[in-house]
Amino acid sequence: MSIDNKLFVTEEDEEDRTQDRADVEDESNDIDMIADENGTNSAIANEQEEKSEEVKAEDDTGEEEEDDPVIEEFPLKISGEEESLHVFQYANRPRLVGRKPAEHPFISAARYKPKSHLWEIDIPLDEQAFYNKDKAESEWNGVNVQTLKGVGVENNGQYAAFVKDMQVYLVPIERVAQLKPFFKYIDDANVTRKQEDARRNPNPSSQRAQVVTMSVKSVNDPSQNRLTGSLLAHKVADEEANIELTWAEGTFEQFKDTIVKEAEDKTLVALEKQEDYIDNLV
């Protein structure tokens, strides 16, 4: 019979039972301590792993910065406020000069209407390809140029830039014009043809006297302002005379020297504080 089933026990048996209970408690305490140590070790391991990931991320950022470092900084200058810089956009495909596309087509004449901001430039036609000289002389008044036409649109905040002597110079762009083919010679030929037909075949009915009723319009008559928007712009452009301009090549270096000289006499002053500028960005 075991000691636990005995009704009466001796002092020796009681001492043995007490010793067994103490041994069991010591074993449970040892198990708890081992569990605590394992938990502490896992927490330390997680913390070390997070630190290693942060260090790795910092290393990756440093590697990216090293891959794309700032090589050099350039002073920035804005000049050319007194210049009138226009940008032309050509809708046609540029010609190839050798294997590279030309910067712009060869221009034989240029015209400008300052009030309407209307540009017209003439480009000589290539008579060696896709050109019917006989038909051009017989039907189109011997046209040998292609006219490009476009209206300059105002653009604020756009600049053209160039680098000289390790400094960047910005020049404000006044207007941008997209130039497209304009077949004026067809309109001129149609007008000439109608005038010749009118001279050859005069209409007697048009020579008859007609009664015309005339009335005086009031100053406040709204019908006087019927031409608005694009219609008014076309009317103004048609009535405005062209200013004939001379197209000059090889003047870019002279233009740059003028801008550099003008920038030397000016100092840029900020219009607002740095804090206000950052607040506007945010």
From Swiss-Prot:
Main location class: nucleus
A GO BP entry: transcription initiation at RNA polymerase III promoter
Compositional bias ranges of the Acidic residues kind: 10-35, 60-70
Positions of modified residues (Phosphothreonine): 61
Domain of life: Eukaryota
One GO CC annotation: nucleus
Protein name per its UniProtKB record: DNA-directed RNA polymerase III subunit RPC5
SUBUNIT field: Component of the RNA polymerase III (Pol III) complex consisting of 17 subunits. Interacts with RPC53/RPC4. RPC53/RPC4, RPC37/RPC5 and RPC11/RPC10 probably form a Pol III subcomplex.
Note: Present with 1590 molecules/cell in log phase SD medium.
A Pfam entry, by short name: RPC5
Organism: Saccharomyces cerevisiae (strain ATCC 204508 / S288c)
Function of the protein: DNA-dependent RNA polymerase catalyzes the transcription of DNA into RNA using the four ribonucleoside triphosphates as substrates. Specific peripheric component of RNA polymerase III which synthesizes small RNAs, such as 5S rRNA and tRNAs. The RPC53/RPC4-RPC37/RPC5 subcomplex is required for terminator recognition and reinitiation.
InterPro entries referenced in this protein's UniProt entry, alphabetically: RNA_pol_III_Rpc5 (IPR006886)
Gene assigned in the entry: RPC37
Segments forming a coiled coil: none
Region spans: Disordered: 1-70
Localization in the cell: Nucleus
Keywords, in A-Z order: DNA-directed RNA polymerase, Nucleus, Phosphoprotein, Transcription
